Every structure is written in C-alpha cells, then in structure tokens.
C-alpha cells in the first residue's frame, strides 16, 4: 500500500514524516508532502543546525587534553570529523612527558593515582631494584618468565613513589600490570617506556 503522509511513521517513499502540518515540529520536513524542503542540507548531527550545515571552523568536539586535537565542523557535512590526537612523541606537560595515544603519561601523575595527592616520584636509586628481575621488580613478563630491566630501562619497570615520610614505595595486585610504569611514559630525554 502507498505511504500515508502525516502519521509520524517513516514509510517507504517518505523522506520524513512529522505528523500533520499543524503538529509538525521538524523545520526540515514539508508536512504536506513528507519530503525534505529543497533547501535542507541536513536533519541532524553535531554540525547541523536548523537544517543547515554549521559553518566551517565551529568546534564540534573540544580538545580534552594537551595530546588531543579539537575537531571543527567542515561546513560540508552534518558529522563532526573523526576524533584525532596529537602524534605520539609530541612533548607535553612542559616537556615532562610525550603524547602517547592521546594521553600524556608521566610518573608523577601515576604516583598520585596509586598513593594519593601528596605522592611524588621516588629518587632514581629506588628504581635500581628493577635491575634484579626478581619477584615484582622487572621490566617485562612473558607468561611465567620475568626479564630484568637494562640499566637504561630501570624507570620502565615497577613504579616507585614517595608518600609523606616514606620513599621507594610500590604497589602490586593480582593484575600483573598494576603498579608498573605505564607504556608511553617518558623515561629519559627522547625515550619512552614500551612493554614490547
């Protein structure tokens, strides 16, 4: 059967159906024909407003962090462009870190997440435990085998933090990655941790 215009049900052959002309609340739809008005560019989307594309340059997805990129409408589409991030390795947080997959992982923030707001990163000497490759102190794990850190990689194993008067503190749990320095964390100038 042919579509019946004005039922508020989108049927085959209709571009829109917003009900009767007196009840229609969709400015893009011609309620008498159930077709979109000829001037309509879009009906919905982050970059669509009053049936027209929002002009180019209007931000549709704000920057969430220093390693994220704000997206703006193109003026040619109702959709916000694909979410994009800064390239990996871009310096961030005043050169304390490098962007990694849209984040700026630094040890200081990881210590705060593990111990609380007063936590700081322990002195370099604490990280030497990662040279042992014993127990919880290592750089890499493959199944049951653990691999010690090389001297230049000691800051890519277990994370050591100071909390109030205590130093060389670390955390661990059943999750083997818990308490380890996060991948992408700056460990030296021009170098980041990578568990692979």
Swiss-Prot record:
Q: What is its main location?
A: secreted
- Where is the Disintegrin domain positioned along the sequence? 2-88
Question: Could you tell me which cysteines form disulfide bridges?
Answer: 5-34, 16-29, 18-24, 28-51, 42-48, 47-73, 60-80, 67-99, 92-104, 111-161, 126-168, 139-149, 156-193
Q: Which cofactors does the annotated protein need, by name? A: Zn(2+)
Looking at the record's lineage, which domain of life comes first? Eukaryota
One GO cellular-component annotation of the UniProt record comes to: plasma membrane
Q: How is it modified after translation?
A: Glycosylated.
Question: Localized where?
Answer: Secreted
Q: Where is the motif (D/ECD-tripeptide)?
A: 66-68
The record describes its quaternary structure and partners as:
Monomer.
Q: What is this protein called?
A: Zinc metalloproteinase-disintegrin-like bothrojarin-3
Q: Which organism is it from?
A: Bothrops jararaca (Jararaca)
């Amino acid at each position: 059967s042919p579509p019946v215009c004005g039922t508020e049900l989108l049927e085959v052959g209709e571009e829109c159906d917003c009900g009767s002309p007196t009840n229609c609340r969709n400015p893009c739809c011609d309620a008498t024909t159930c077709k979109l008005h000829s001037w309509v560019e879009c009906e919905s989307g982050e970059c669509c407003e009053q049936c027209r594309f929002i002009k180019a340059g209007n931000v549709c997805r704000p920057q969430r962090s220093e390693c994220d990129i704000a997206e703006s409408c193109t003026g040619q589409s109702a959709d916000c462009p694909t979410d994009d991030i800064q390239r990996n390795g871009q310096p961030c947080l005043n050169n304390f870190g490098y962007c990694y997959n849209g984040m700026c992982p630094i040890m200081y923030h990881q210590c705060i997440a593990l111990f609380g707001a007063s936590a700081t990163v322990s002195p370099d000497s604490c990280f030497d435990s990662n040279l042992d490759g014993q127990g919880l102190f290592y750089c890499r794990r493959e199944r049951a085998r653990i691999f010690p850190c090389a001297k230049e990689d000691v800051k890519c194993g277990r994370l050591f933090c100071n909390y109030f008067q205590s130093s060389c503190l670390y955390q661990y749990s059943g999750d083997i990655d818990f308490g380890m320095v996060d991948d992408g964390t700056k460990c030296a100038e021009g170098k980041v941790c990578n568990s692979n």
